Structure formats: structure tokens, C-alpha cells
Amino acid sequence: FDILGILIERAAGMPFADFLRTRIFEPLRMRDTAFFVPKDKRSRLAIGSNNPAREVPTRTPSVIHAAGGLYSTVDDYLQFARMLLGRGQLEKTRIISHRSLDYMTSNYLTPEQRQQSFFGIKKFWHGEGFGLGVAVKDDLAVNSPVMGVGSPGTFGWPGVSGVWWAVDPREDMIQIFMVQGGDNEAPRRAFQERAYQAIAD
């Protein structure tokens, strides 16, 4: 992802953080998403119990990692997820083409690659594959490592310290789970399962 960030900078002729701000965050009205937290918003920052002393930048860092480092809110995440659920468009604002979204949410792992360990977890890709930056669920019967339960075609990805999101186009559903610190797998799976149980057939 960091290499992709450099390529974006060169193609766009602007810093990666500025590209995200002008091409994605501002058009989607994501007012609280950036690689830093301004001083006047620090009181709203949730600090993880596993790393309470972590330094949080108050301005754009000199080195940006495209692989991570954004701070955001549930409301902003929802705007982004609504755009993805809208096949690249939110209301009258198009961010990516529907064809690009189809590429993004297709699996590109071979059966052999899916058998490999990932993050030290065996069968990490059991029941799901990997697209362009997102996990993609393809087996309804498997409670898969990243996506958990969900319809085939559900896609999303976890973040640091417990953030997790998913878009299920088949059920027209967005799930956003935000906690800070600790192991979130059990409560996140319970959150998911109850959401699906609430859907009337």
C-alpha cells in the first residue's frame, strides 16, 4: 500500500494526504478523517487501553504511510461505506466507477495462496478471498477470519485497535464496528451475528 501511495502522489502531482482530502474526504463530507487530530478535536479522541500513551499527531506527519494511520469517526466511515454500497457513488458524487468497484471487490487469490498462513493464522483466507485492498467473502457457510458471517460478495477490512467495517451488497447493509484496544473478535462476531439475525427473510 505504501508503494501505491507513492504512485498516486506521482500520478496526481500532489501529496498522498492532499489527494485523499481533495478527491475522497471533501467530496464525501468526511470532515473528521485525516492523518492527524487537530488540537480542537482532541477531546473527542478515543484512546485505546492497550496503548494509552501513544502520541497522536496534531498536524499532517512528514511521512505518510498509505497502509494505515488515518483517524476517523463512525459518521465519516459511514459516508465512505455508503459510497461503496452505492457502487462508487454517494448521492450525486461519484468517487470511482462501478467497474473499478467490481475489480476492487473481486477475489485475486489462487486456491494455493488461500492455503497459506497470513498474520501467522493458518487458513486465514478460508471462506474469503482478497480483492484490491479488501477481503471478499465467497462462502456463506464459513464464519471466515476477517469477514465473519455474511452473504457472498460481502467485503471490508479491519483496522488497527479494533476498527472493522463491512459492506454487504446483497442485503443492502453496512456494518461498522469501532472499539479501541484489546481483542475485539468475540464482540465483533456477536455484533455481526445479531445484525444478520435481525434481517427478516
List each language-model region with its residue ranges.
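Hydrophobic alpha-helical segments
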Residues: D2, L78, P169, R189-Q192
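Generic C-terminus detector
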Residues: V179-D201
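Short, structured beta-strand/loop micro-motifs enriched in basic residues and often containing a Trp
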Residues: G156
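Short, small/polar residue-rich loop motifs at catalytic or cofactor-binding pockets
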Residues: G159-S161
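Short, well-ordered beta-strand elements
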Residues: W165-V167, E171-G181
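Short acidic, gly/pro-rich beta-turn/loop elements at beta-sheet edges
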Residues: R114, S144, F177, A186-P187
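Short, surface-exposed loop or secondary-structure junction motifs
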Residues: F1-P152
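A generic secondary-structure signal marking the coil-to-beta-strand transition
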Residues: F130-L132, G153, V163, E171-M173
